[in-house]
């Protein structure tokens, strides 16, 4: 009996795509005015990726696939992230997220964080303090102290 190879997506891919879609369309656009730009429902979000070498690159790709603008990419390892940098030739490149937020602060509506776990809270807090919306891989924080600091940001 021959089994033909299916081109359909599996459950994991569907849930991942649905999760990213829900996060970006229900969290960011509804309140994407705090960062300096006023958005209408027809405007595309200007999103920056922080930590794009592996999983973060996949997250940025999902956001780009939803039609949003990828305006900046940041990764400390330019060689490892070169493949992702090449996918978005119009996005500005950075190796320090703080410099990126300083230079492009008013142009960025939200950030996608795909850095190592222990850096999530610090980067998310800095982005939130600057009025940016955050999509972050889990865990967002490692302690109650970090969670409280994020809530205050």
Model-found features: residue ranges?
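N-terminal secretory signal peptides and thylakoid transit peptides that target proteins
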Residues: 2-22
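Acidic/polar helix N-cap motif
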Residues: 10, 77, 96-97
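N-terminal Rossmann-like dinucleotide-binding module
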Residues: 18-88
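Beta-loop-alpha module in the N-terminal Rossmann-like domain of NAD(P)-dependent dehydrogenases
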Residues: 53, 91-149
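Solvent-exposed, polar/charged alpha-helical surfaces in well-ordered, non-transmembrane soluble domains
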Residues: 57, 61, 79-82, 86, ...
């Amino acid at each position: 009996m021959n089994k033909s190879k299916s081109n359909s997506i599996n459950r994991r891919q569907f849930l991942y795509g649905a999760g990213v879609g829900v996060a970006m369309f229900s969290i960011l656009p509804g309140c994407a005015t705090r960062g300096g730009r006023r958005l209408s429902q027809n405007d595309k979000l200007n999103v920056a990726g922080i930590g794009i070498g592996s999983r973060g690159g996949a997250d940025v790709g999902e956001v780009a696939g939803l039609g949003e603008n990828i305006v900046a990419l940041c990764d400390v390892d330019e060689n490892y992230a070169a493949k992702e940098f090449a996918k978005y030739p119009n996005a500005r490149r950075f190796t320090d997220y703080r410099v990126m937020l300083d230079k492009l602060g008013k142009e960025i509506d939200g950030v996608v964080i795909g850095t190592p776990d222990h850096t999530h809270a610090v980067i998310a807090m800095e982005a939130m303090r600057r009025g940016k919306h955050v999509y972050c891989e889990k865990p967002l924080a490692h302690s109650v102290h970090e969670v409280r600091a994020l809530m205050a940001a």
